[in-house]
Curated annotation (Swiss-Prot):
Annotated GO biological process: rRNA processing
Cytoplasm found in the keyword field: yes
Required cofactor names: Zn(2+)
Family indicated by similarity: Belongs to the endoribonuclease YbeY family.
GO CC list: cytoplasm
E.C. number(s) listed in UniProt: 3.1.-.-
Gene Ontology MF annotations: metalloendopeptidase activity; RNA endonuclease activity; zinc ion binding
Gene: ybeY
PANTHER family linked to this entry: ENDORIBONUCLEASE YBEY, CHLOROPLASTIC (PTHR46986:SF1)
Subcellular location: Cytoplasm
Cofactor note: Binds 1 zinc ion.
Record-given protein name: Endoribonuclease YbeY
Organism in which the protein naturally occurs: Streptococcus gordonii (strain Challis / ATCC 35105 / BCRC 15272 / CH1 / DL1 / V288)
Keywords per UniProt: Cytoplasm, Endonuclease, Hydrolase, Metal-binding, Nuclease, Ribosome biogenesis, rRNA processing, Zinc
Protein residues bound to Zn(2+): H130, H134, H140
Length: 165
Protein backbone atom coordinates (compact mmCIF):
# COMPACT_ATOMS: atom_id res chain seq x y z
CA UNK A 1 0.00 0.00 0.00
CA UNK A 2 1.24 3.46 -0.84
CA UNK A 3 0.65 5.94 1.98
CA UNK A 4 1.59 9.61 1.85
CA UNK A 5 2.12 10.96 5.37
CA UNK A 6 2.41 14.68 6.13
CA UNK A 7 2.98 16.18 9.59
CA UNK A 8 1.61 19.74 9.51
CA UNK A 9 2.29 20.10 13.24
CA UNK A 10 5.98 19.25 13.35
CA UNK A 11 5.21 17.43 16.61
CA UNK A 12 4.96 13.80 15.50
CA UNK A 13 8.01 11.62 16.15
CA UNK A 14 9.57 9.40 13.49
CA UNK A 15 8.50 6.44 15.64
CA UNK A 16 4.81 7.42 15.41
CA UNK A 17 5.09 8.18 11.68
CA UNK A 18 6.63 4.74 11.11
CA UNK A 19 3.99 3.09 13.30
CA UNK A 20 1.25 4.83 11.30
CA UNK A 21 2.75 3.56 8.04
CA UNK A 22 3.19 0.04 9.42
CA UNK A 23 -0.23 -0.31 11.04
CA UNK A 24 -2.01 0.98 7.93
CA UNK A 25 -0.08 -1.46 5.74
CA UNK A 26 -1.02 -4.20 8.22
CA UNK A 27 -4.70 -3.17 8.15
CA UNK A 28 -4.59 -3.08 4.34
CA UNK A 29 -3.22 -6.60 4.28
CA UNK A 30 -5.90 -7.81 6.71
CA UNK A 31 -8.67 -6.29 4.57
CA UNK A 32 -7.33 -7.09 1.09
CA UNK A 33 -6.47 -3.48 0.26
CA UNK A 34 -2.71 -3.92 -0.30
CA UNK A 35 -2.77 -2.32 -3.76
CA UNK A 36 -4.58 0.83 -2.64
CA UNK A 37 -3.27 4.34 -1.94
CA UNK A 38 -4.17 6.87 0.72
CA UNK A 39 -2.93 9.96 2.54
CA UNK A 40 -2.59 10.81 6.23
CA UNK A 41 -2.07 14.33 7.54
CA UNK A 42 -1.32 15.06 11.19
CA UNK A 43 -2.97 18.32 12.24
CA UNK A 44 -3.62 20.54 15.27
CA UNK A 45 -7.00 20.89 16.98
CA UNK A 46 -7.38 24.26 15.28
CA UNK A 47 -6.96 22.72 11.82
CA UNK A 48 -9.17 19.77 12.77
CA UNK A 49 -11.86 22.24 13.79
CA UNK A 50 -11.64 24.02 10.42
CA UNK A 51 -11.83 20.73 8.50
CA UNK A 52 -14.69 19.41 10.64
CA UNK A 53 -16.65 22.60 9.95
CA UNK A 54 -15.88 22.48 6.23
CA UNK A 55 -16.58 18.79 5.59
CA UNK A 56 -19.01 17.78 8.33
CA UNK A 57 -20.65 21.09 9.30
CA UNK A 58 -19.61 20.41 12.91
CA UNK A 59 -18.23 23.37 14.89
CA UNK A 60 -15.57 21.65 17.01
CA UNK A 61 -12.30 19.78 16.59
CA UNK A 62 -12.40 16.00 16.31
CA UNK A 63 -9.85 13.20 16.60
CA UNK A 64 -9.88 11.87 13.03
CA UNK A 65 -11.57 13.05 9.86
CA UNK A 66 -11.90 10.38 7.20
CA UNK A 67 -12.54 11.50 3.65
CA UNK A 68 -13.41 8.51 1.51
CA UNK A 69 -12.65 9.05 -2.15
CA UNK A 70 -15.54 8.12 -4.39
CA UNK A 71 -15.19 8.83 -8.11
CA UNK A 72 -18.11 10.79 -9.50
CA UNK A 73 -18.45 8.49 -12.49
CA UNK A 74 -18.31 4.72 -12.60
CA UNK A 75 -16.36 3.16 -15.41
CA UNK A 76 -18.40 0.42 -17.05
CA UNK A 77 -16.37 -2.30 -18.73
CA UNK A 78 -17.62 -5.54 -20.18
CA UNK A 79 -16.34 -8.57 -18.27
CA UNK A 80 -15.31 -10.25 -21.52
CA UNK A 81 -13.14 -7.23 -22.36
CA UNK A 82 -11.35 -7.64 -19.04
CA UNK A 83 -10.70 -11.32 -19.74
CA UNK A 84 -9.43 -10.64 -23.25
CA UNK A 85 -7.35 -7.60 -22.27
CA UNK A 86 -5.59 -8.14 -18.91
CA UNK A 87 -3.76 -4.83 -19.34
CA UNK A 88 -7.16 -3.09 -19.18
CA UNK A 89 -7.94 -4.78 -15.87
CA UNK A 90 -4.56 -3.69 -14.51
CA UNK A 91 -5.11 -0.12 -15.71
CA UNK A 92 -8.53 -0.01 -14.01
CA UNK A 93 -6.98 -1.29 -10.76
CA UNK A 94 -4.42 1.51 -10.91
CA UNK A 95 -7.12 4.08 -11.71
CA UNK A 96 -9.18 2.94 -8.74
CA UNK A 97 -6.25 2.78 -6.31
CA UNK A 98 -6.81 5.99 -4.29
CA UNK A 99 -9.22 5.34 -1.41
CA UNK A 100 -9.08 8.52 0.63
CA UNK A 101 -7.44 10.73 3.19
CA UNK A 102 -7.23 10.91 6.98
CA UNK A 103 -6.63 14.00 9.09
CA UNK A 104 -5.55 12.99 12.60
CA UNK A 105 -5.52 15.63 15.34
CA UNK A 106 -2.35 15.16 17.36
CA UNK A 107 -3.79 17.40 20.12
CA UNK A 108 -6.97 15.30 20.39
CA UNK A 109 -4.95 12.09 20.38
CA UNK A 110 -2.92 13.33 23.37
CA UNK A 111 -6.09 14.41 25.20
CA UNK A 112 -7.85 11.11 24.56
CA UNK A 113 -4.83 8.98 25.48
CA UNK A 114 -4.79 10.68 28.87
CA UNK A 115 -8.58 10.49 29.23
CA UNK A 116 -8.72 6.77 28.36
CA UNK A 117 -5.61 5.87 30.35
CA UNK A 118 -3.48 4.44 27.57
CA UNK A 119 -0.44 5.58 25.62
CA UNK A 120 -0.29 8.25 22.94
CA UNK A 121 1.23 5.57 20.70
CA UNK A 122 -1.85 3.36 21.15
CA UNK A 123 -4.25 6.24 20.53
CA UNK A 124 -2.48 7.26 17.32
CA UNK A 125 -2.60 3.66 16.09
CA UNK A 126 -6.27 3.39 17.02
CA UNK A 127 -7.16 6.60 15.16
CA UNK A 128 -5.26 5.49 12.04
CA UNK A 129 -7.06 2.12 11.94
CA UNK A 130 -10.43 3.70 12.77
CA UNK A 131 -10.05 6.22 9.95
CA UNK A 132 -8.77 3.55 7.56
CA UNK A 133 -11.89 1.47 8.13
CA UNK A 134 -14.11 4.51 7.51
CA UNK A 135 -12.51 5.24 4.12
CA UNK A 136 -13.07 1.59 3.25
CA UNK A 137 -16.81 1.79 3.80
CA UNK A 138 -17.16 0.77 7.45
CA UNK A 139 -19.30 2.84 9.80
CA UNK A 140 -20.95 2.74 13.21
CA UNK A 141 -24.37 4.34 12.81
CA UNK A 142 -26.29 1.18 13.75
CA UNK A 143 -25.50 -1.40 16.44
CA UNK A 144 -24.79 -3.97 13.72
CA UNK A 145 -22.40 -1.67 11.86
CA UNK A 146 -20.71 -0.72 15.12
CA UNK A 147 -20.21 -4.36 16.12
CA UNK A 148 -18.69 -5.19 12.73
CA UNK A 149 -16.42 -2.13 12.54
CA UNK A 150 -15.26 -2.12 16.15
CA UNK A 151 -14.72 -5.89 16.09
CA UNK A 152 -12.48 -5.64 13.02
CA UNK A 153 -10.73 -2.59 14.47
CA UNK A 154 -9.88 -4.42 17.70
CA UNK A 155 -8.83 -7.53 15.76
CA UNK A 156 -6.38 -5.47 13.67
CA UNK A 157 -4.97 -3.56 16.66
CA UNK A 158 -4.53 -6.74 18.73
CA UNK A 159 -2.96 -8.73 15.87
CA UNK A 160 -0.59 -5.81 15.25
CA UNK A 161 0.32 -5.86 18.96
CA UNK A 162 -1.14 -2.50 19.93
CA UNK A 163 -3.38 -3.39 22.85
CA UNK A 164 -4.80 -1.21 25.60
CA UNK A 165 -2.07 -0.67 28.16
Amino acid sequence: MYIEIVDETGLVSEEIIKQTQDILEFAAQKTGKEKKEMAVTFVTNERSHELNLEYRDTDRPTDVISLEYKPELDIAVDEEDLLNHPELAEMLDDFDAYIGELFISVDKAREQAEEYGHSFKREMGFLAVHGFLHINGYDHYTPEEEAEMFGLQEEILTAYGLTRE
